[in-house]
Amino acid sequence: MAVLALTAAACAAPDAGGGDEGVVLTLWTRAATEAVSKAYADAYNATHRDRVEVTAYPNEEYPAKLASAAGAKALPDLFAADVVFAPQYASQGLWADVTDRFAALDVKDRVAPSHVRAGTWEGRNFALPHTVDLSVLLYNKDLYRKAGLDPERPPRTLREYAEHARKVDALGGDVHGTYFGGNCGGCVEFTMWPSVWADGGDVLDAEGQEATVDSPEMADVFALYRSLYEEGVAAPASKDEAGPTWLGALQSGNVGIAPGPSVWLDAIEAKGVDVGVAPISGLDGGESTFVGGDAMGIGATTGHEDAAWEFLAWTTSDEAQVGVVAKGKGVPTRTDLAENEHAEADPRLVTANSLVAKGRTPYARNFNASFNDPQSPWLRTVRGALFGDAALALADGDEAITKSLRQG
């Protein structure tokens, strides 16, 4: 696939423009992003000559589907992917180079910087943010009141988060102070890495070739979560949580405060839980977030590159980011739109949106195998750091993750 970009021009037909009827653009996405992708497409189709048709695939099947299409030189006109895959797909030439087009956008300096970085390879731009999901603290205001905590005053440090969790846990019964995905590499990186960043630490070098998990900052963050589990403040199910029941635990109304995805706000509220939102902090302050979500680029084999770019550029506009994303209670991909007419009606959304400019998206070509795969060296590191020999796990993890990052 690394040579795909070199052959794409020969394989793709000229952009015919589709005459008066316009062209029909194919857009692929994973199921997790389907609703937002279709909302973009519906709004675009209502006001443009060209049309965008969205096809979604099951999350677990999507990477293989893209690999197969790339091998057959039959990629869709546009496709989105989990942003942590962006460096890999950019390096393999699956997306067309949009460097010059992106540089000409008036809003280029206001597009989520960590997403732009993720879609960059060897100084060239290949993808833009399509959706943004942020890690935040989600807390149960009713349990805060019962525990004697101020529901309008969330924790401002990670140590304070632990104190609040302990106070809620003291309510007893079915109530637990906190919850986390202790058997899920992606869950842990999404929720705990921001505390490392807020404390001035890092997890990877800038090029994604060397792990730096064996650091004082990482050790301290793991130690805090480990203590909450050992004290029984974190729900017992945290140890084996691999992701599928994570949301359900927070929807139960029996968890005081926990880090999680900002997109869960509505889903938790739908169960009758009064939810507060706060930034994830370092042990003694600061704040950061894992800027997740999906990146989107133009399929390298498209015959409609101009039309595809017109849609991709439109998704960065006020019309799309306020009229589609913010209206649907999503996080705008533009840093200057954190406060908008829809978010201002709910201060929690402004809190989340403002983190886009402060957060990070990890950059590594071999990220999935190194961190997200169930067999990844990162998950082994997590298990050891939380429930085993922490010092040994972090030391071994540094070496094993670095080796994995440099493969391929």
Q: Where do the model's predicted regions map?
A:
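Extracytoplasmic/periplasmic substrate-binding proteins
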Residues: 191, 222-304
